[in-house]
Every structure is written in structure tokens, then in C-alpha cells.
């Protein structure tokens, strides 16, 4: 069983998506079962995968007790982790490379479908706009929480 016990503790939704995707990709490569923490996940308040996305119905929920952790050693792809990750460990780190999950791309596209309660209001807003809508993403991120200048 491959897990990501601390998913959500290292960042917000984008980081959690990378963590989840990496877990699925490595598990699929080795034929391991995999699981993610349940929605409440020990009180981590920004753990939001469950509330945002229609995650795989095949997922198991829980955390591995008394397990070893596999720590990402740096902020780019690590062949050793992808090619030789042992079973019965929990991943830890950011894992921000598509190479960890390119093998499960189609599954992830399904998993990362927004719940209708999020998607429908967005569709309604887009439909209400005359002309061609333009979307702009402004990343404000963590500095807004600590820097009074925003």
C-alpha cells in the first residue's frame, strides 16, 4: 500500500493535486494499492481535494500507521523514487514534475473533474457573458497570509 499521509500539509490545492497525481502515478507503475487520507485528515484545514474534485471511486481512504516515509530529495524529478519506490511507505514532498504521473494522465483528468456544485456556477457565469470571455489567473498565494502589503 502506497500512501501520502501528510497530503495537504505542504501547500494548497495545486500542491495537493501534484501530491495526489504522484501517488497515483508511482502506485500504478509498480502495481501497488494506494490510499489518501480521509477528508478531515487530522485537522489540516486546507486539505481540499475531496471537496473540489470527483476523485477516483476506487480510492481507499486512510493513513499508513508505523510506516517509513520516502522524502523527495529535491524539487525536480527523482528517477530513484519513481523507478524503485518500495511498497508500504508514505510519500512526502512536493513532487512537482509531470514525469511522476504521465502514466496515469487519463485517470487524473477524470479525477480532477470539479464537483457540479463548483462547475455549474462557473458555466452559468461564462454563459452570461456577452462576447468572448477572457479568464485571468492572478496567483497571490501564501505571502498574503504573512505580508500585510499583500
Segment roles from a protein language model:
Residues 8-18, 145-147:
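A short, glycine/small-residue-rich beta-strand->loop->alpha-helix junction that serves as a flexible
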Residues 16-28:
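Histidine-anchored nucleotide/phosphate-binding helix
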Residues 32:
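Short glycine/serine/threonine/alanine-rich loop segments
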Residues 1-5:
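Extracellular/lumenal mucin-like low-complexity stalks
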Residues 39-150:
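Secretory-pathway luminal glycosyltransferase catalytic domains
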Residues 6-9, 88:
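Short, flexible coil/turn micro-motifs enriched in small/turn-prone residues
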